[in-house]
Amino acid sequence: MISKLKKVGQIIPKNSKDIKKSKIGLGFEKLDRDVFDPEKAYDKVAEAGVKWARLQSGWARTEKEKGVYDFEWIDKIVNNFVERGIEPWVCLCYGNAIYNKEAEKVFGAVGCPPIFTDEQKKGWESYVKAFVKHFEGRVNYYEVWNEPDGQWCWKHGPNATELGLFTRDTGKYIKEVNPNAKVIGGVICSKDLAYLSEAFETGMGDYLDFVSFHEYTNDETKVFETVEAFTELAHYYNPKIRLIQGESGSQSRTGGHGALWSAGWTEEIQAKQLARHTIADLMSGVHFTSYFSCMDMIEALNGTVGDTNSYLDYGYFGVLGAEFDENGKSVGTYYKKPSYYTLQNICSIFAGDFELCKMPLMFWNMESALTMDHDLKRTQVVTGGFKNESGRVFAYWYPSNILTTSVDTVTKMVFFTEYDKFRVVDVMDGSIYEIPEEMIERKGHGVYRINDMPVKDTPLLLVTGDFI
């Protein structure tokens, strides 16, 4: 139990501009529909220490007259992130009513792909090429569409062959303008291997550097299976493709809309879900992971133009909380939720280069006087290792039902370390703990046994050396 340890310090937050490299990002989506004020969020996002910000390109907001592109609105966003040391990556989307009459009725032209007429296809090609050219040197990663396997984002009905051809062509346009740009495809929200394989059969993999996927779940252990399956499938078509976790998250209260809306979320549970999912993503070996999202905002995926009530579908996924005005725009002070501080701690701990590693560590399943029960076995706990040039981290937690069950128990660990120093870090509040001598048995030859090592339903880190 954590109360047996001695607190000796606190994780110091790092600003994004002070972090050279990181695998952790935050969603900054939906500004194509102007749903929140980015000016009130930039500094708070940078203070969290994320290194990636996902944007949506907003074709309909940018090209209101055929062939005329007004990039001013998104220029400001991209420049603000670049100035703060954050890499913007852009999801190219959605439709445009000047090319597609069906999009005239759809708020934000969401889910109206330009694939049916030569004029639509040419309009999209010209827009993509203009966008990539305009942002060359500032934007390096481009994602093709968003959740095309969902009815809300491919409104005439999801079709994997259509998506594959669309992605293939868009990837070709991107590479023609900027051969160094990275192209991300898939962007899928389901676990439909058949859909993804059918899309790959069109040849889209020839133009992809990455496949992204969205994993909204209260069970973060599902991430490992998803990453393994999608990676192996992608490698069949192109062995160079890697994975990006493009959206994950949970809500901070009940009564919301969007993914996982029906569950009994609280701000505390949201913070737990962020911690467990983010570190699971890091364990899975994805290129980077992006949490959805920076801000409480309307979902705005199924709105009708002229009918405000149709898109007042509030989602409470943000690490920043907000109020809403009569038009559904996020207003107020944009306060920091507990999940924000947990994200900030994780960003600080995992700043810089690190790699996955195995740890010479075992759990001893013995009777515990503290719990009057047997200690947890390693097979009952999620575990993973990381190392850098200065130390190692062993991350672990008990994967209880995050919505119903909190855990504060103990186990016994035996491990080898080449370092003289080891501590425990709680990512939830950033506390750094020393292990009291009475809990340590020194076995010699670099081997230690820790009795009554705390285990929680949120990640604890056994840190050896100077990883942090």
Q: PLM features: residue spans?
A:
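Hydrophobic faces of well-ordered beta-strands that scaffold small-molecule active sites
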Residues: 22-28, 53-55, 88-92, 140-144, ...
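Glycoside hydrolase catalytic-domain groove-lining segments
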Residues: 212-259, 277, 287, 291, ...
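C-terminal beta-strand-rich structural cap/linker in extracellular carbohydrate-active enzymes
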Residues: 436-468
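Active-site cleft segment of glycoside hydrolase catalytic domains centered on the general acid/base Glu
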Residues: 35, 103-233, 254-274, 407
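N-terminal substrate-binding region of glycoside hydrolase catalytic domains
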Residues: 2-130, 143
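Solvent-exposed beta-hairpin/edge-strand motifs
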Residues: 414-433
